[in-house]
């Protein structure tokens, strides 16, 4: 399925290239994903957005964004490794946030480092386990927005476009995980954990699906201890992740991932196998 998606993305890229046969090789007529007609209005940062809706987020409620607000951000995590299920993680210079999208293989179009311009008006923001998330309504609560809706609200910004200048030096960066930081300070960011030990319950691989460990929504939560993990931190991995069978070392390791939190427990989501630094 993922291979097919990348073939589609490649063909889409060739289509965009073909549209430049009039001599303008720098800027294609349009990118075959998202809404190329979007033009930014009043912009807001992720920190400002989370501050404005802080009470909604902390109470696990939700609210529709009715103002014409725009967000400039960059993708720092996607579903390429099949561990961020129907989720996109983005950041700007002030923080990070998770976006729920009811669509698969979005990493084929929005790789890590891709700049996005998002029209927030009419989307929903709220809390899931006290963590901020942007999405849509599902069964009367906050969930994932439909893919068709997402594509109407997002524009992919390439570095050779004039619009890219407004992003300044925005890029994906990594911060050291700190268990004492708040949700707004750390969630949706790429974090580094050093000198941590991963629990080896059951079959000692990252996410066994053989019944040897308990699953929560088809995910394995492995306790992280030592190093900078703090007291309530787990490595959360889907049993569908492409790296689910990686063996867990018996010694402390360094690992990376997207920081999320659920009701006071930090959950680290490795994006791909490369986030597990002991794998060569």
Indicate residue ranges for each PLM-predicted region.
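OB-fold nucleic-acid-binding modules
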Residues: 21-85, 89-115, 119-280
């Amino acid at each position: 399925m993922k291979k097919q998606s990348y073939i589609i993305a490649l063909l889409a890229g060739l289509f965009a290239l073909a549209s430049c046969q009039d001599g303008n090789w720098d800027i294609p007529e349009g990118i075959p994903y998202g809404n190329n007609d979007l033009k930014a209005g009043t912009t807001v940062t992720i920190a400002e957005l989370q501050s404005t809706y802080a009470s909604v987020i902390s109470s696990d409620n939700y609210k529709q964004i009715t103002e014409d607000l725009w967000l400039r951000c960059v993708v720092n995590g996607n579903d390429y490794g099949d561990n961020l299920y129907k989720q996109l993680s983005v950041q700007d210079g002030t923080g990070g946030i998770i976006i729920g999208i009811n669509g698969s293989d979005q990493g084929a179009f929005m790789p890590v480092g891709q700049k996005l311009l998002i029209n927030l008006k009419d989307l929903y923001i709220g809390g899931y386990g006290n963590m901020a998330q942007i999405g849509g309504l599902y069964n009367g609560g906050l969930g994932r927005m439909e893919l068709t809706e997402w594509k109407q609200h997002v524009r992919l910004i390439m570095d050779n476009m004039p619009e890219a200048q407004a992003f300044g030096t925005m890029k994906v960066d990594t911060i050291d995980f700190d268990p004492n930081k708040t949700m707004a300070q750390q969630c949706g960011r790429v974090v580094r954990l050093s000198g941590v030990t991963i629990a080896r319950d059951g079959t000692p691989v990252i996410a066994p699906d053989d019944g040897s460990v308990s699953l929560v929504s088809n995910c394995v939560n492995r306790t992280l201890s030592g190093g900078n993990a703090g007291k309530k931190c787990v490595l959360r991995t889907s049993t569908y992740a492409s790296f689910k069978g990686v063996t867990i070392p018996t010694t402390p390791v360094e690992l990376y991932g997207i920081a999320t939190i659920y009701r006071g427990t930090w959950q680290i989501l490795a994006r791909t196998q490369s986030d597990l630094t002991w794998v060569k």
